[in-house]
């Protein structure tokens, strides 16, 4: 009887592995939608200014898109597929210089077998702090 149980378990394990239940392959993410930044409003501020509400105009922004200020994601308000807004704090306007502004459309999650979309980042535009 014990030999029969071992044979059944061995056969079941072999069947499961042959059917692919022992491991799964994953599908890599497909490219996401690349956003395009066309304008920053305003595109400059004076050093020492108080916070500035920045409007980023462009195309292909998804509802979870984020504005990146000097490479770091900042709290973003989605207005439409063509417009996003964010507040630039006083500390980021304290000294003169420039800030690269981009937009990232985050990717979608991958399921058990992969898939989803990858995150995509827009072209860069320059915000000037005079």
Regions found by a protein language model. Name each.
Residues 82-86:
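Short strand-edge motifs at loop-to-beta-strand transitions and within beta-strands
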Residues 75-79:
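Short beta-strand segments within Ig-like beta-sandwich modules, predominantly Fibronectin type-III
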Residues 1-18:
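Sec-dependent bacterial lipoprotein signal peptides
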Residues 92-99:
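Short glycine/proline/serine/threonine-rich loop/turn segments at secondary-structure transition edges
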Residues 59, 89-91:
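Hydrophobic loop/turn residues within beta-sheet-rich immunoglobulin-like superfamily modules
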Residues 104-108:
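Beta-strand-rich extracellular modules
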Residues 19-69, 98, 109-130:
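Beta-strand/beta-sandwich contexts
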């Amino acid at each position: 009887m014990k030999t029969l149980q071992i044979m059944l378990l061995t056969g079941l394990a072999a069947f499961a592995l042959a059917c692919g239940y022992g491991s799964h392959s994953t599908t890599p993410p497909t490219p996401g939608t690349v956003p395009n930044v066309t304008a920053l409003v305003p595109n400059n501020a004076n050093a020492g200014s108080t916070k500035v509400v920045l409007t980023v105009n462009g195309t292909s922004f998804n509802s979870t898109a984020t504005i990146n200020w000097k490479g770091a994601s900042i709290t973003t308000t989605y207005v439409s597929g063509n417009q996003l807004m964010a507040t630039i704090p006083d500390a980021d306007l304290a000294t003169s210089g420039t800030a690269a502004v981009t937009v990232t459309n985050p990717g979608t999650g991958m399921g058990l077998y992969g898939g989803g979309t990858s995150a995509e980042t827009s072209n860069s535009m320059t915000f000037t702090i005079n």
